[in-house]
Swiss-Prot record:
EC number(s) stated in the UniProt entry for this protein: 3.5.1.18
Positions of the catalytic residues: 67, 126 (proton acceptor)
Note describing how the cofactor binds: Binds 2 Zn(2+) or Co(2+) ions per subunit.
Broad EC category: hydrolase
Subunit structure: Homodimer.
Phylogenetic placement of the source organism: Bacteria, Pseudomonadati, Campylobacterota, Epsilonproteobacteria, Campylobacterales
Binding site for Zn(2+) 2: 96, 127, 340
Binding-site residues, Zn(2+) 1: 65, 96, 155
Organism: Campylobacter jejuni subsp. jejuni serotype O:6 (strain 81116 / NCTC 11828)
Summary of the function given for this chain in its UniProt record: Catalyzes the hydrolysis of N-succinyl-L,L-diaminopimelic acid (SDAP), forming succinate and LL-2,6-diaminopimelate (DAP), an intermediate involved in the bacterial biosynthesis of lysine and meso-diaminopimelic acid, an essential component of bacterial cell walls.
Coiled-coil stretches noted in the UniProt entry, renumbered to this chain: none
Full protein name: Succinyl-diaminopimelate desuccinylase
Length: 365
């Protein structure tokens, strides 16, 4: 089947995270000339497809996920019965990211590759906890001395036009929970209470929206963003016993968890508080002079006639795991204007260009 037909079939699988619904077996059968390894951990199914081309040279990998977020109600069609209409395919996962997966599967068919090995790393655990997916496959590859040198993750990266954005890194994510302790009491006798809201009020303006670093050419500033704040029992005559606050920092490599801790400790000096911090993902950056960045840039410009912005914007992705294992990685895919949305759709023209970009990258790597 051709690339579009394969994409339509792939979109029919109800692969709501972490269930692949048979999609990985379907992919393995499509690429029967690749050696297939099904790697399972904690009930999560992953697939490594790999093919040796030469005894020497570099190992290039493509990464992606077949799991999708729940579809919800209000669609113009059954979200797992793809609808082709006016140049688009409507289905859950059309942009995020079955189009990317279908594109690199099409690209590796009957391709000429001067390197040593091509691999495809696929998981059904990205949209959920993402603990036993790509990371587990890379750990398995490390144990077998099979780690790739370079990788492309086919996440939907483009914003307004196909070809306008390549991700060369991602910010990390630090989650914070702050508990300010007080002493509950009658609102008419504030002198007998310790009101944590009043105590924390002067500190709030020092925390909310604070930039922990000035940013750089590649990264925006590491900003503290408050996501939740609550205290009291929802009544007007009792002061709160404590105040609970949650925040997130999307951090660049210039700001660490320890930097966040030091700043919060400094501004909360004198308060009775508890602080809990957790790094849910780490920041990474692939240098713009690296081969994978240069070659991807060349292929994107050649096929799309756009000059892509090399950036680190957006949330986290599985690319961070490649970076953690020392693999030089970039991300490129179709536009992301409908990801996780009702009536998610992908432009057929964008998808066809993505197939060509990946094939050109492989043949000229």
């Amino acid at each position: 089947m051709n690339a579009k037909e394969f994409l339509i079939e792939l979109l029919k699988f109800k692969s709501v995270t972490p269930n692949d619904d048979g999609a990985l077996n379907f992919i393995a059968m499509e690429l029967s000339d690749f050696e297939a390894f099904f790697i399972e951990k904690e009930g999560i199914k992953n697939l490594l497809l790999t093919k040796k081309f030469n005894d020497e040279g570099e190992h290039l990998a493509f990464g992606g996920h077949v799991d999708v977020v729940p579809a919800g109600e209000g669609w113009k069609n059954d979200p797992f019965e793809p609808l082709e209409e006016e140049g688009f395919i409507y289905a859950r996962g059309a942009q995020d990211m079955k189009s990317g997966v279908a594109a690199f599967i099409d690209a590796v068919k009957d391709v000429s590759f001067k390197g040593r090995r091509l691999s495809l790393i696929l998981t059904s655990d990205e949209e959920g906890e993402a603990k036993y997916g790509t990371k587990a496959v890379l750990e398995w590859m490390k144990e077998k001395n099979m780690l790739p040198d370079y990788a492309v993750v086919a996440e939907p990266t483009c914003v307004k036009k196909m070809g306008d954005s390549i991700k060369i890194g991602r910010r990390g994510s630090i989650n914070g929970k702050l508990l300010i302790r007080g002493k509950q009491g009658h609102v008419a006798y504030p002198e007998k209470c310790i009101n944590p809201v009043h105590d924390f009020a002067p500190v709030l303006k020092l925390l909310a929206g604070f930039d922990l670093d000035p940013g750089s050419a590649e990264f925006s500033p590491s900003k503290i963003v408050i996501t939740d704040i609550r205290g009291g029992m929802g009544v007007c005559n009792v002061t709160p016993n404590d105040l609970k606050l949650m925040f997130n920092v999307r951090n660049s490599p210039d700001t660490s968890l320890e930097d966040v801790k030091s700043y919060v400790e400094k501004i909360c000096h004198g308060l009775n508080y508890e602080l809990e911090l957790k790094q849910s993902s780490e920041a990474f950056l692939t240098n713009i002079d690296n081969k994978i960045v240069q070659k991807m840039n060349e292929s994107v410009q050649k096929i799309t006639h756009e000059v892509p912005e090399l950036n680190t914007k957006g949330g986290t992705s599985d690319a961070r795991y490649f970076a953690k294992y020392g693999v030089k990685v970039v991300e490129f895919g179709v536009c992301n204007d409908r990801i996780h949305a009702i009536d998610e759709r992908v432009s057929i023209e964008e998808f066809e260009k993505l197939c060509l970009v990946f094939k050109d990258l492989i043949e000229n790597f």
